[in-house]
Amino acid sequence: MLVRFRLLSFWRAGTGGGVSATLDSLCARDINGLPLIPGRQVKGLFREAVRELEEDLRRAPPGTLVQLFGSRADPDNPLPDPPLPAVLRFSDARLPEADRVQIVDRPELVAGLFQTRRSTAIGPNGVAKPHSLRFGEVAVPVTLATEIDPLADAPGNWASLLRMAMPLIRAVGSGRTKGQGRVIVSDGTV
């Protein structure tokens, strides 16, 4: 299934790293330096949306989350059940091929996909807290695409369950609760 992420605001799918004294956080990039959402983060977004669909909204059958995304071993259980594997494979969400071809050999266009944002923590007295200034790289709003593929054990309704979960994914990456990474997720056929 082809899935599109239409980013509506600046966003960062972080790498967990920075660049010495210049940037505290970096955007994930592909081998050509273009922004992406790693497949692992895509999976996490869908996992949380399906959890909400099943547990909070009760619009998916009980057990759907484990059926699609598998389970982990429970170290607190003296007689643990073996973990169940996931039945879906998630790829990195990248710029569409037509866009990548136009941009990849033009360093000025690649650089234009990113900006640096500054932030600081404000104390109760309305003044910036000491040593709280941060510089983070963000990507400009773009549309990314990814493939989600079923494995042999996937139930027949996996795609319809993920389509129902798509509207529940409202933001991606870091800063989601602060307005960054607002997104519309849709089936690629739309």
Where are these regions (language model features)?
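Small/polar/charged residue-enriched interaction surfaces, especially the RNA/DNA-contacting tracks
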Residues: 1-190
